């Protein structure tokens, strides 16, 4: 902290650049005039957006895959527990549990359909007393293991009464009729049906092609009732059996006990309300409306009166389906949009509306649901009933009235309930507090801050506790970013003190999942292809040569969409005679260049309208056929022109254009907040950082600001990154740190000027006006002076950044995974094991591929086992595995990936485990690799790849020093020389590495093969990242600084190493140059010691 006190005389500014798979971080020290003095820290942190190798294809996150594995484990555990409880119930009721091999008729022991025959006989005839109990047990236990489907919202009590034959049972009848031609009797049970079919036909019963298919639990419950009736079992005992067989515990509501209490004084007995609760939706709308102010003639801003508030709240809540704008709100209040202030102000809880007014999101979801019966109920229910239903669906399954309503829904509608995605998260207060605050704000002119003071007696400094910066939100990609930002800011504060300014910039997909970002990329590619086709059409059909601008493409699109008619007057226009016009102009410099504000018009209308809103001009222009009603009619006649244009996109565009045509006020001019992001997660991050650093100025900008800033300052040609000068080249990952440094120096006035420049640029390129936007530096003298001063600061920043680059202190970091993670064995179809007769002899390779460690131990402990040749053939051989004797005539099973026709005697051992009667490979689930030096006259180096499976039993200890026994799959897959050295104590354990570790390598001696050719193009590439362990003796490395996305026409060697396989290097070759394993702290500095037992850097000696 001595350094922090020394720095306190200066000013710290932190910049954060959030991307989809990266976070750029930078800390600057500036003087009193804002001139950068020192670049204290600059790094690019690369992350995987929460998606591992197993989920890369479908963009499935680790969280999703681990959730599937966790639920699979819980399901199996729960199923075992339920079956054990069923056995106890059967014993208590006097039904003995049949032991293996015991059966009604010894002649039927090998009959695969015997349990189906028993179920059929129990329904058709009354069995003797001595057979009745075991038979009922067998049938009930079989049904319990295949009990069928039941809607999770229906209770087990619904099965206690007889039910009609389900649609699943009717479908079974149809399948049997189509397959066998047999017509089943009415009232037949599933057991009878299968026994009848199995007796007479050779068909598959289960599986994807099986005839049994899916059954409803009511069908099996009907069979149990018939069995009990036929065998003389009392109704009470029958009901006990039904409850035990079909018992189910719903997980809904299990997390309510962990919800935090209301933080307001006196409200601690209430839990925080879910954000999907209608009461929170109402509170959010009212609290944002309470922030609104109306600018009056004297320059003062007054709050809305109580009547005005109620008027606006009613307007916003009466129709959640409407796409309202703040212009609509202003018109409802009878004021100009420019006089309505406070639309972008945060409430005291950090809530902030986006570009549009707030709506009741829950109400919109319920009114748009495809569950028609629930939608109808919602529209007829009152507010109290709606709130109860939302709580029932979200967290509280105890409401009996709601349960009855859900139970009455058609079964197909009940099945859709799980697809109903309500707003997630928790409000800061309880439902009771939300109601009190909403009612108070609606009845007075108090905002949320004043309402809290009056109702709960808190002072001006009180605020609800905010989440920690790195607290997870549930989205793996966002959680990665939050954790990185939280750790970095904590390290900056610890090292240099509290920053005065923290600026965050994020790309559009920076706070979304990888799947969403990929879908948006696909949409962008489709749009790009459409634009390419439009450019070809303009050149081919209209004879335009040279550069084709975006304005040309938009003009063609508008012309075709409008049917070659001027939108304003209907006159026929052509490509060369039409002009683009902004329906609603923007106050100040620039224009709103969104597609919904651009239409093709004739020269006469464009010249006459000038910079006037269409609705105002249409009333007084005097041109025939010009009017709001006529223009809207033309818009409603639009039809989509390209295959890639969806009907939803066209409907959205038409709705936006119609709204613009009706508007009578010009768009407000760009202000200093115009470039601040309004994305939900950006607001949340802003709120968390501001709560953690209350004295710090925090702003969150859109990504376009940084791009405009780099170009305006001209720094792309001055930064010494790898790649082409004069443009942002993505081949060098350190460009994220550049962006973070740029956004750290951003100021509100400069952001406003940059936004105005971008708006002018778009307007001039679309309309073909003279390109003057590059000379624009501000609308006032002060703004221009400030902009020029900022340019000077940016040039000085480039010098500081280049100094850090020259010193190799702009770091590229990446987190490493040290804890045990789930594999994908539960999702992979097992491969078949290969059988070998024990007496025929086995090679060492076959023994190392033994399907279990116990089998390997038994084989290698034979007296005639040879480490090179394995076991010779011997007819008197006998081994014991898990207490069972295996003789020479018996068969043992081993892993093998070869075809049945190929010999596996020399097949190399590989990572696999036995599951579900087969085996699955576990190659991707290597936890870490241990580096050993094998001592001798000339020491050699080797590595032991440690599979996660071999560490499960030691998951609560030190995984990197855990003993790896000889029978483990890790040791069996290691190099023979290493296995022997470890056994004889001749191997020295030097340290461990994991995927993601950084290696600093002296590459001067690597001049051959692909790596040599790569280094000719990119010399002095000394920092590499471990990407995998290709074999038991080779590492796969890729350069840390270089990114594949920036490659353009690379050589084959560069393409192979950067984008494809990487540099595959033998561990014994690599260790000869004694590389250093570099572990870094949150600021990117190498860590050589740690009091918290964090991984430290070390050199392979």
UniProtKB/Swiss-Prot annotation:
Highest taxon, organism lineage: Bacteria
A UniProt-annotated Pfam family: RuvC_III
MF terms in GO: DNA binding; endonuclease activity; RNA binding; zinc ion binding
Annotated stretches, region: RuvC-II: 468-513
Amino-acid positions noted as binding Mn(2+) 1 in the UniProt annotation, renumbered to this chain: 17, 736
GO biological process: defense response to virus
Residues binding Zn(2+), per UniProt: 566, 569, 602, 605
NCBIfam families (alphabetical): cas_Csn1
Entry similarity comment: Belongs to the CRISPR-associated protein Cas9 family. Subtype II-C subfamily.
Record's subunit section: Monomer. Binds crRNA and tracrRNA.
Protein name as it appears in the record: CRISPR-associated endonuclease Cas9
Gene expressing this chain: cas9
